[in-house]
């Protein structure tokens, strides 16, 4: 891995780092996650997100390298969609942690899920390993979507909580 490799791995981590630095007091909704018996602890969530962002960055590096590197036209669709989903992923963090808006966060996650699934199909002919590296991301988005949905539902109907 040349110098570009660590850059591709590190860039996805910049968003969460900046968001955490800017958010002085996270939403109280984060504490609500503990009410869900199947929700992982906060440290596990943090570890999984850091791992997924790093793996996602490495996968994008593989695609970039496979298509010849640089900033050429063949990279526009695969890495353009990747950049868009990365921005959506960072937006989810803002909506969920800072804006205290589980409904918008859920909508963001649904769009993100579709984009990541599209990336798997687009990246598969380019680099199979890169596409496979996105599958744990899809699995984690499923868990995150379930948690966010539950928090959104409970915020709409607080008396319906089991």
From Swiss-Prot:
InterPro entries: TspO/MBR-related_sf, TspO_MBR
Keywords: Cell membrane, Endoplasmic reticulum, Membrane, Receptor, Transmembrane, Transmembrane helix, Transport
Protein's GO biological process: 5-aminolevulinic acid import across plasma membrane; enucleate erythrocyte differentiation; import across plasma membrane; intracellular cholesterol transport; lipid droplet organization
Tissue spec. comment: Expressed in liver, bone marrow and spleen. In spleen, detected in red pulp but not in white pulp.
Residues annotated as transmembrane: 3-23, 44-64, 79-99, 103-123, 129-149
Membrane protein topology class: Multi-pass membrane protein
Compartments where located: Endoplasmic reticulum membrane; Cell membrane
Deletion consequences: Decreases erythrocyte count and increases reticulocyte count. Abnormal erythroblast cytokinesis and differentiation. Decreases hemoglobin levels in maturing erythroid cells.
Gene Ontology cellular-component terms listed: endoplasmic reticulum; endoplasmic reticulum membrane; plasma membrane
GO molecular function: 5-aminolevulinic acid transmembrane transporter activity; cholesterol binding
Pfam families per the UniProt record, alphabetical: TspO_MBR
PANTHER family given in the database record: PERIPHERAL-TYPE BENZODIAZEPINE RECEPTOR (PTHR10057), TRANSLOCATOR PROTEIN 2 (PTHR10057:SF4)
Domain notes: The C-terminal region mediates cholesterol-binding.
Free-text function comment from the UniProt entry: Cholesterol-binding protein involved in the redistribution of cholesterol from lipid droplets to the endoplasmic reticulum. Required to meet cholesterol demands during erythropoietic differentiation. May play a role in transport processes at the plasma membrane of erythrocytes, including regulating VDAC-mediated ATP export, and import of the heme precursors protoporphyrin IX and 5-aminolevulinic acid.
Family: Belongs to the TspO/BZRP family.
Oligomeric form and interacting partners: Homotetramer. May also form homodimer.
Protein name (record): Translocator protein 2
